[in-house]
């Protein structure tokens, strides 16, 4: 994706405010008009390669039921739907992103839910989901054990979860917002719920380096 003048301005402003609490909050849930638009613009091009690779790793097959936690700009939804899943639940708590998703996606297989992923009862039944995807979202889930219990509830036996994140950069962000940035500590928690494997992924440039964590329901 070729960067525009506005993209370069967004990068400049991001570097100025990168480690502030207001930037952290808007990376989690865009609110402030200026900062929120900076984060939205950065997400579109800064995660492009990571998102494409994450969707490939999710290995969606025809008639899968998918949950994406934090669908954001919808980049991953556009890629997932090409693999002909039966259903995608796109979860998003940001009002800004939620409005964009509902405006941009009209495929009947995609259900956009403005729900927190720690409680999906009444929306998603027990053991009905094949795969769950979280891209740059795991940092914000607090308390994380409540989310993991809910993922365990909705996931089919031998179903999988793919968590992808840039834990190095995330560890420098405001800790009151970015809660789960210690990779080794996170893996220890995940192992209490699922079979876990982790891989460092280098797609050729620093902005596209990330960790991919695969969880399988025991």
What are these regions (language model features)?
Residues 35-52:
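Conserved SAM-binding loop and adjacent beta-strand
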Residues 67, 72-120:
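Class I SAM-dependent methyltransferase SAM/SAH-binding core
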Residues 122-132:
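A short acidic, Gly/Pro-enriched loop at the edge of an enzyme's catalytic core
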Residues 131-144:
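A short SAM/SAH-binding and catalytic strip from SAM-dependent methyltransferases
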Residues 145-157:
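A short glycine-rich, Lys/Arg-flanked "PGG" loop and its adjoining helix->strand segment in the class I
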Residues 158-166:
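Conserved beta-strand signature within the Rossmann-like core of class I S-adenosyl-L-methionine
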Residues 202-218:
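Core SAM-dependent methyltransferase catalytic element
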């Amino acid at each position: 994706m070729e960067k525009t003048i506005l993209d370069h301005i967004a990068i400049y402003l991001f570097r100025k405010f990168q480690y502030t609490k207001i930037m952290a909050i808007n990376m989690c849930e865009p609110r402030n008009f200026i900062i929120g638009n900076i984060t939205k613009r950065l997400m579109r091009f800064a995660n492009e390669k990571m998102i494409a690779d994450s969707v490939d790793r999710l290995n969606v097959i025809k008639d899968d039921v998918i949950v994406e936690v934090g669908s954001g700009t919808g980049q991953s939804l556009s890629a997932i739907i090409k693999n002909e899943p039966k259903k995608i639940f796109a979860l998003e708590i940001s009002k800004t992103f939620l409005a964009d998703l509902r405006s941009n996606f009209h495929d009947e297989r995609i259900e956009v839910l403005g729900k927190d992923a720690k409680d999906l009862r009444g929306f998603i039944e027990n053991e009905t989901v094949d795969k769950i995807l979280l891209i740059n979202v795991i940092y914000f889930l607090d308390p994380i054990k409540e989310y993991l219990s809910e993922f365990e509830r909705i996931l089919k036996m031998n179903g999988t979860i793919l968590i992808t994140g840039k834990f190095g950069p995330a560890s420098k962000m405001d800790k009151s917002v970015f809660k789960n940035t210690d990779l080794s500590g996170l893996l220890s928690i995940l192992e209490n719920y699922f079979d876990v494997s982790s891989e460092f992924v280098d797609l050729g440039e620093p902005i596209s380096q990330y960790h991919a964590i695969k969880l399988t329901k025991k």
